[in-house]
Amino acid sequence: MAIVDLVNAGEQQQMGSKRAAAEDGDGGVDDSREYYCRRGVRHLCDSGITRLPGNYVLPASDRPGQAAGAAAAAGGSVKLPVVDLSRLRVPSERGAVLRTLDAACREYGFFQVVNHGVGGEVVGGMLDVARRFFELPQPERERYMSADVRAPVRYGTSFNQVRDAVLCWRDFLKLACMPLAAVVESWPTSPADLREVASRYAEANQRVFMEVMEAALEALGVGGGGVMEDLAAGTQMMTVNCYPECPQPELTLGMPPHSDYGFLTLVLQDEVAGLQVMHAGEWLTVDPLPGSFVVNVGDHLEILSNGRYRSVLHRVKVNSRRLRVSVASFHSVAPERVVSPAPELIDDRHPRRYMDTDLATFLAYLASAAGNHKSFLHSRRLY
């Protein structure tokens, strides 16, 4: 059900008192939670708050730098393995690139794709229109606000704003992208060039996904014909994320630890660091590589690979100095298609590890649970 678009005049007059209540800093849930869910963090940032509202304050054990390891506390970073698509297209070099891709999916669950063929004007245009969307007046953005996780176009806040015990410092715009011609007319009309720019980016992103996914199946030794056909007719959801400047970033997160549904997620980052991956028990910040896509293995690919490829936990930190924008594209099969471990990857030494699943099952789970800390994927495990 859509959330009310505009607060009434009485709510506007109460804003000062709500801000004061929000800045009590005790970490508890105060009476402003519904207000925050309706307005989002960009509005809070623009209102000039100087302390983090209690609804956004994480328990001490979950705060950045506290949950895992010295590297996180010290601000450790990681340069992810790099997959060069231009080399993948050269027959004499393809084998070496496939080995790099295979090792990255097994060890990190993350890698960066370069020389992907998507022009700088497409990538830069997408980041630019994303920033301009979040600069729109609040009433314009609120037209698309919904708490329905199944909505094809949805502006929202936090991670799962209906069920999050503590809200995340993040606003987002989700756009269903397939079939593109059927959904683009439901996308926002402001900024005026959003539909044109985002559709061009979505098409290019889908092409990169298909090329990388075909390579991943080849590296696994899995016959990819049927899978690739299902993915070509599958789903693509683009999430445009906005992480505004936060007055006390050490107390909260932009996104909690989670893994992604689907086969692969392709993330376009701006120059502001924030994405962290869990590796060897430590939270490590991914160094942004201009013009690249950060790609991570999703739950469906871990299932299809029978656990050989890893869908790993990741999260997003925020900062007090610069707004951060990213665009994540989630790719999978159609909701009714079943994902199973590939028969080629099951034998006496490698018994089947996962139950069959589908996207509809995931969406139902997300609507009924917090959906973080890989709990959905764990729910599909046989042992």
From Swiss-Prot:
It is an enzyme of class 1 (oxidoreductase). Expressed in coleoptiles, leaf sheaths, leaf blades and root tips of young seedlings. Expressed in vascular bundles of mature leaf blades. Expressed in developing culms and nodes. Its EC number is 1.14.11.-. Fe cation binds at residues 258, 260, 314. One of its GO terms (molecular function) is 2-oxoglutarate-dependent dioxygenase activity. Plants overexpressing SLC1 are infertile and exhibit defects in shoot development characterized by slender and crinkly leaves. Belongs to the iron/ascorbate-dependent oxidoreductase family. Involved in the regulation of shoot development and salicylic acid (SA) homeostasis. This is Probable 2-oxoglutarate-dependent dioxygenase SLC1. It comes from Oryza sativa subsp. japonica (Rice). The lineage of its organism: Eukaryota, Viridiplantae, Streptophyta, Embryophyta, Tracheophyta.
